[in-house]
């Protein structure tokens, strides 16, 4: 697990400003990624790292896109599922702020914007019907479209910073997606994904 240096700065500022909201948001974001991590371990994904960023956490996998569809769907949905359970729990014990944080993390991660869970689920869905490379191209276009829409309707500077980071990640993905596609083909897992969905 790696922690981005700016994360410590944000935590210090949150402590100095008595912002428990930010600390809770970061903790539940980490819990979200732990959900991904545990399922990734169970299905023997090749885990590269978990990075704790100032505005959340991110699990990096070396072999994402090279497993059976049910394994990847299970891994991708486990993070949002953790937040859904937390949302229901905090509603039940009447902690609306913590419930709000978890439903926000859940909805945000299901947006079809790379590298969020929703974008990867979209890629899995599209790749079952069309060529994988074409699916990746659509994934990138949808990501850029949603970033533009969210940038226009978002007023808060903190959210715009997050959108800027997502835009940067999409551009990196755009530069490398052909290489990722070739690696996926060479791994000989693409045909398994199309055939062995329920096994």
Language model features with spans:
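Hydrophobic transmembrane alpha-helices and their immediate loop junctions
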Residues: 1-199
């Amino acid at each position: 697990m790696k922690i981005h240096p700016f994360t410590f700065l944000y935590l210090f500022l949150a402590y100095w400003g008595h912002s428990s909201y930010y600390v809770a948001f970061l903790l539940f974001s980490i819990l979200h990624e732990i959900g991904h991590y545990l399922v990734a371990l169970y299905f023997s994904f090749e885990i590269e790292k978990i990075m704790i960023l100032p505005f959340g956490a991110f699990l990096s996998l070396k072999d994402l896109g090279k497993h059976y569809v049910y394994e990847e769907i299970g891994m991708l949905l486990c993070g949002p599922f953790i937040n859904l359970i937390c949302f229901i729990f905090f509603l039940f014990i009447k902690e609306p702020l913590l419930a709000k944080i978890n439903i926000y993390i859940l909805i945000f991660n299901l947006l079809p914007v790379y590298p969020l869970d929703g974008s990867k689920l979209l890629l899995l869905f599209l790749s079952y019907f069309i060529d994988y490379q074409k699916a990746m191209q659509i994934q990138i276009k949808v990501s850029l479209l949603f970033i533009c829409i969210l940038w226009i309707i978002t007023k808060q500077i903190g959210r715009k910073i997050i959108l800027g980071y997502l835009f940067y990640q999409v551009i990196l993905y755009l530069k490398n997606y052909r290489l990722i596609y070739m690696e996926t083909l060479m791994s000989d897992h693409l045909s398994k994904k199309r055939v062995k969905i329920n096994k």
